[in-house]
Amino acid sequence: MATIGRRAYAEMFGPTVGDRLRLADTDLMVEVEADYTLRAGGYGEEVKFGGGKTIRDGMAQSQRTNAEGAMDTVMTNALILDHWGIVKADIGLKGGRIAAIGKAGNPDVQPGVDIIIGPGTEIISCEGMIVTAGGIDSHIHFICPQQIEEALTSGVTTMMGGGTGPATGTFATTCTPGPWNIARMLQAADAFPMNLGFLGKGNASLPAALHEQVNAGVIGLKLHEDWGTTPAAISNCLDVAEETDVQVAIHSDTLNESGFVENTIAATKGRSLCAFHTEGAGGGHAPDILRVVGEANFLPSSTNPTMPYTVNTLDEHVDMLMVCHHLDPAIAEDLAFAESRIRKETIAAEDILHDLGAISMMSSDSQAMGRVGEVIIRTWQNAHKMKQQRGKLPGDTERHDNFRVKRYIAKYTINPAIAHGISHEVGSIEVGKFADLVVWKPAFFGIKPSIILKGGFIAMAAMGDPNASIPTPQPVHYRPMFGAFGGATARGSLTFVSQAGLAAGIKERFGLAKTLSAVKNIRGVRKQHMIHNNYLPKMEIDAQTYLVRADGQLLTCEPASSLPMTQRYFLF
């Protein structure tokens, strides 16, 4: 039997079982756990497109029509990196969704084929490439529409939050308040190759105005201290959410004016909600908002400005906070408010709580202290920093960091999808889900994707000079592709809405072009449902020293003086 060397095989068909890859310039290594292309019975039946390759008529390309089961697109020899595994496979796309994960080819002449290539099948060659689910950013201030392209080029394909543009309320809070504003934002969503969902304003002590917003289509309600997150508002907002199966996101009371963290916890009465700022630099009860990490009904997330903790983190935060929350540095009380939120001890503990799987999600807080294009970068920077400072996690080996990688990718993919009731559509690479997929060169993983697919069609890519004779000459930069134009935009993306809004006929009333998908199964979600990130420690925060303990363990780490995934990738 003919043989081929492991390196030569990897260079031709991509890595297989036992091969390892470094993620960008981090210290994180992944090892391929399984190879679904071996369903043919072993090596030798791989498919590959190109001159002299196998995807040709009568070879790995069958005669079958798309109606007879041939795929619209096949992504060949991809290394899938997802919460459920790190595996080599071919990925079949049909009708804008993931139709199959396995072995592609021509079943008439090849064994083990479960993904049919036909004359009507496009090929995206993923040999040597990593494929992930599109990222989900659940903390968006919709301050400017240009955020959407910035997020898409970073590998984010779903954005959830609130706002109406550069209004003062939107600078500070993620709320799209009232049915008229909600309708305008839903109509605007039709223009973008991005899945979008909007939060209404949840700060009210009576339910009528909240029901009005849910009926207009918001996927959840945001409680923000700048609008008054009182115990009465918390309880009322959760009452409405329980009745309508939408999420509640909370930014709690930094100043402890209307109650302390204990009062906020009590006001929830055990009902589920998302703690958008689980560390206080972003906002929330000072100094002990981290207490909610130990509560089973709080789904904790971080925003990216404090992630990971570096030598520059503290210095940049005061000015950011003054701008975002409409504060005046000439007013002593405003300055004290800002400084009360910025504590190096709790910021350092946040890094470790992510590594322990106690904080479940990552998000941006776009243009409101966070950077919309850096959710993915900062997630992996923290994973790298924690490996350097804390060593291997249980389940990892000297050869690989597979468990740590699965824990961290879940923070911006499947877990926000579960928390916001959209995991039936997006959040992972699984059969039946919307084909929002991101293709990366391993050397650029987490930083600069090569191709971003929306609904199974390429919407954005790193593309060279359009006047060049080939696609690769400089200047190479991100350019919208055909999936970002015309009717393809509406077909390739979803707008998430409430069940009540969908039932009320908002698609027709507002004249919406995109497919609407209702959020669901939200109110039963608990911390235990956060994949790889469901650790529920007993939290203690010293009110004088701000030192943080989880199950008695002191959580402290040094700030990073340098990080991977930074300057060397952004020379141009």
Swiss-Prot record:
Gene Ontology biological-process entries: urea catabolic process
InterPro entries recorded: Amidohydro-rel (IPR006680), Metal-dep_hydrolase_composite (IPR011059), Metal_Hydrolase (IPR032466), Urease_alpha_N_dom (IPR011612), Urease_alpha_subunit (IPR050112), Urease_AS (IPR017950), Urease_asu (IPR005848), Urease_asu_c (IPR017951)
CDD domains associated with the record: Urease_alpha
Protein's cellular compartments: Cytoplasm
GO molecular function, one term: nickel cation binding
EC code: 3.5.1.5
Catalytic residues identified in the record: 325 (proton donor)
Cofactor comment: Binds 2 nickel ions per subunit.
Positions annotated to bind substrate: 224
Binding site for Ni(2+) 1: 139, 141, 222, 365
Residues binding Ni(2+) 2, per UniProt: 222, 251, 277
Cited PROSITE patterns: UREASE_1 (PS01120), UREASE_2 (PS00145), UREASE_3 (PS51368)
Pathway: Nitrogen metabolism; urea degradation; CO(2) and NH(3) from urea (urease route): step 1/1
SUPFAM superfamilies, per the entry: Composite domain of metallo-dependent hydrolases (SSF51338), Metallo-dependent hydrolases (SSF51556)
Keywords: Cytoplasm, Hydrolase, Metal-binding, Nickel
PTM comment, free text: Carboxylation allows a single lysine to coordinate two nickel ions.
EC primary class: hydrolase
Matching PANTHER family: UREASE
The family this protein is said to belong to: Belongs to the metallo-dependent hydrolases superfamily. Urease alpha subunit family.
Quaternary structure note: Heterotrimer of UreA (gamma), UreB (beta) and UreC (alpha) subunits. Three heterotrimers associate to form the active enzyme.
NCBIfam families to which the protein is assigned, alphabetical: PRK13206.1, PRK13207.1, urease_alph
Name this polypeptide is given: Urease subunit alpha
